[in-house]
């Protein structure tokens, strides 16, 4: 993936990367700001992940987009891992390829925004809910709650 091959260009990419940059410069990892003004449009999780990435790999487009690329890759893998025992290797591979090659999945994997992470947590919640319906257990249900909570920390009810 060529994550750093073009500048941050979308309004969302600018807002997310700007708020993350300000988070790193002012040291406030609880409240987000952009140009000194509060930015409470989105919950905090994606900013933390971008801050980790930028701290580890430098202040580049690639580093801001890395959390989205990793979340999209995990999303495809999770769908494949869920489909494989139910459909077989070849159909599960086809499902993963179709997801991977869809413009939506490809697009959000390349943007510094919260969408890929939210899709990963939604997929995990739905998959664990399905597993709960297959074989009810409190553990499966708790995992559904965890994925939903992480989804709320990603995109939230804000």
Residue ranges and their predicted role:
Residues 1-158:
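Membrane-integral, polyisoprenol-dependent glycosyltransferases
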């Amino acid at each position: 993936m060529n994550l750093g091959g073009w500048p941050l260009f979308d309004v969302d990419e600018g807002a997310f990367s700007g708020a993350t940059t300000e988070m790193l410069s002012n040291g406030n990892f609880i409240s987000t700001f952009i140009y000194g003004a509060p930015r409470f449009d989105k919950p905090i999780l994606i900013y933390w992940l971008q801050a980790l990435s930028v701290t580890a790999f430098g202040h580049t487009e690639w580093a801001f987009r890395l959390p989205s690329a990793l979340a999209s890759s995990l999303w495809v893998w999770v769908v494949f891992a869920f489909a494989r025992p139910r459909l077989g290797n070849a159909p599960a591979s086809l499902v993963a390829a179709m997801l991977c090659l869809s413009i939506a999945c490809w697009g959000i994997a390349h943007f510094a925004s919260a969408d890929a992470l939210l899709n990963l947590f939604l997929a995990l919640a739905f998959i664990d809910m399905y597993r709960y319906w297959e074989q009810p257990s409190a553990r499966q249900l708790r995992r559904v709650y965890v994925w939903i909570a992480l989804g709320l920390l990603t995109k939230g009810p804000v």
